[in-house]
C-alpha cells in the first residue's frame, strides 16, 4: 500500500491534489487538505497524520520545497521520532527552479527546511527539469548541480529523474513520465 499525503499547504506550483484521479488509477491513496483544489486559500489540515504514519505500507509526504512548507511537517516531528530509522527524508532539487538558483542558495535552504521540519534530510533527489523542454543536456547540467549541492551539504544523491525518451547515462537514473498539467 502506498499513501501520499499533501502537506504542501503553502506553495501551489505543483499541486499534488490536482492528480487525485491519476493516483487512484495507480492504486495510490491520496490524502489532501480539506480545501485543496478550491478557490479558498486556507491552509487547513483535516486528517490525522500521526495515525496514517502507523498504517502498513509506504507513506510519502509532500511538504513543498521551502522552509515555509516544512513548518507543517515540523508539527509531527515528535510523533515520527519512534520511526526515525525507517524515514527517508529527501531534499528534492531542481537546478531550474527559482529557489534552487545556485548551489549556494540551494545548499543554504536545506538547513532552514531541516530547522522548520525538525527533521534531518537523508539524501538528495535530483529532479532538475524544464518540463516538456527538458533535454539530455538539461539532465546533465542538473546532475552536475546536484553533485555540487551534495558536496556542500554532505548528503548523498539518491537518484536523478529523467523522462523516458531522454537518453542520459549516470548513476541511479530513474526514468519517469511527465504528468504535470
What are these regions (language model features)?
Residues 1-43:
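N-terminal phosphate/diphosphate-binding loop that engages ATP/GTP or pyrophosphate donors
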Residues 27, 169-181:
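Active-site regions of enzymes building and remodeling cell-envelope glycoconjugates
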Residues 32-38, 57-72:
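Switch II (G3) loop of P-loop NTPases
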Residues 54:
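Catalytic phosphate/metal-binding cores of nucleic-acid and nucleotide-processing enzymes, i.e., regions
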Residues 2, 57-61, 87-89:
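Generic beta-sheet signal
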Residues 43-50:
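A short, well-structured juxtamembrane/interface segment
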Amino acid at each position: 500500500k502506498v499513501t501520499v499525503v499533501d502537506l504542501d499547504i503553502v506553495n501551489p506550483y505543483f499541486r499534488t491534489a490536482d492528480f487525485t484521479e491519476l493516483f487512484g488509477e495507480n492504486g495510490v491513496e491520496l490524502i489532501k487538505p480539506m480545501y485543496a483544489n478550491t478557490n479558498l486559500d486556507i491552509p487547513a489540515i483535516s486528517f490525522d497524520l500521526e495515525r496514517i504514519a502507523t498504517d502498513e505500507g509506504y507513506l510519502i509526504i509532500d511538504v513543498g520545497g521551502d522552509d515555509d512548507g516544512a513548518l507543517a511537517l515540523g508539527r509531527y516531528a515528535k510523533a515520527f521520532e519512534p520511526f526515525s530509522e525507517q524515514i527517508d527524508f529527501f531534499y528534492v532539487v531542481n537546478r531550474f527552479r527559482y529557489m534552487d538558483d545556485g548551489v549556494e542558495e540551494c545548499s543554504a535552504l536545506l538547513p532552514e527546511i531541516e530547522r522548520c521540519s525538525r527533521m534531518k534530510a537523508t539524501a538528495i533527489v535530483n529532479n532538475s527539469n524544464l518540463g516538456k523542454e527538458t533535454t539530455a543536456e538539461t539532465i546533465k547540467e542538473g546532475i552536475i548541480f546536484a553533485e555540487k549541492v551534495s558536496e556542500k551539504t554532505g548528503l548523498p544523491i539518491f537518484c536523478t529523474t529523467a523522462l523516458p525518451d531522454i537518453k542520459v547515462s549516470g548513476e541511479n537514473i530513474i526514468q519517469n513520465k511527465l504528468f504535470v498539467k
